[in-house]
Regions:
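Beta-hairpin (beta-strand-turn-beta-strand) motif
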Residues: 61-62, 121
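Active-site-adjacent betaalpha module
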Residues: 1-8, 17-18, 35, 44, ...
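Short catalytic/ligand-binding loop motif for oxyanion handling, primarily in non-cytosolic enzymes
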Residues: 64-68
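Glycine-rich loop(s) and the adjacent beta-strand/alpha-helix scaffold that form part
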Residues: 39
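Acidic/histidine-rich helix-loop elements
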Residues: 19-35
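Short beta-strand segments at enzyme active-site cores
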Residues: 54-61, 171
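Short hydrophobic beta-strand that contains or immediately precedes a catalytic carboxylate
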Residues: 10-12
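Short N-terminal secondary-structure initiator segments
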Residues: 14-22, 56-58
Length: 207
């Protein structure tokens, strides 16, 4: 059984861009989202985690005007920046309601003082944000990981957190991916790298 003292949820990119039809990445992810009921399962996890007192860490994606000035970019970053995905006009202004950078409405009721939104990760993994620091300062050594995209940000967070010494459980039906091939590739990697791979219902049974 999990416990609230040293176990927390880490959710990558639970934002409009890949999860809702108005998002610029939704066309690539919608089939897998529908197949595994990603939004429904993420909502279940958020709701029960709040009810039972588990901390929730969100590692979001944001891009700003200054990111356009990067002198070199990898393919994924180039695509996102050129299409102004996860876009914010400024670090000093609020995120526009319903924009690609906004959190999906389904999880907003569960965002409270036990939800820690860390700095945005810039490419795929948490190396460039404060996720590790926040987890350590909160006494967390076990992470239940879910979110978007299964083969990119979720995979990269899993790898880095494993390297940092965390016990990482990936929730395989609370993720989404840009197509079935990408989803299956992610599942293969989870099986080799994560400490455990569980379904939403299997996680809920241990909360």
């Amino acid at each position: 059984m999990f416990n609230q003292k040293n176990v927390a949820f880490v959710i990558t990119d639970p934002q409009v861009e890949f999860l809702k039809s108005t998002g610029k990445g939704f066309g690539a992810t919608k089939d897998v989202l529908e197949k595994v009921n990603t939004i429904e399962n993420l909502t279940k996890l958020f709701a029960l985690a709040k009810e039972r007192g588990y901390k929730r860490f969100i590692s979001p994606h944001y891009f700003y005007p200054h990111d356009h000035k990067w002198q070199f970019k990898a393919a994924g970053a180039t695509m996102m920046i050129e299409n102004e995905m996860f876009w914010r006009d400024s670090q000093y202004s609020a995120i526009p309601e319903g924009s690609g950078a906004d959190m999906i409405e389904e999880i907003k009721p569960f965002l409270d003082e036990d939800t820690i939104v860390v700095n945005g990760h810039k490419i795929f993994g948490p190396e460039s944000n404060d996720l590790n620091l926040q987890l350590r300062k909160n006494g967390i050594d076990t992470v239940i990981l879910a979110g978007m995209n299964a083969n990119l940000c979720v995979d990269s967070h899993m790898r880095e957190l494993i390297e940092l010494g965390y016990n990482v459980i990936v929730v395989n039906d609370a993720v989404g991916a840009p197509g079935e091939e990408a989803y299956q590739a992610a599942l293969t990697n989870y099986g080799y790298i994560a400490n455990q791979v569980l379904t939403t219902e299997e996680v809920i049974a241990q909360l």
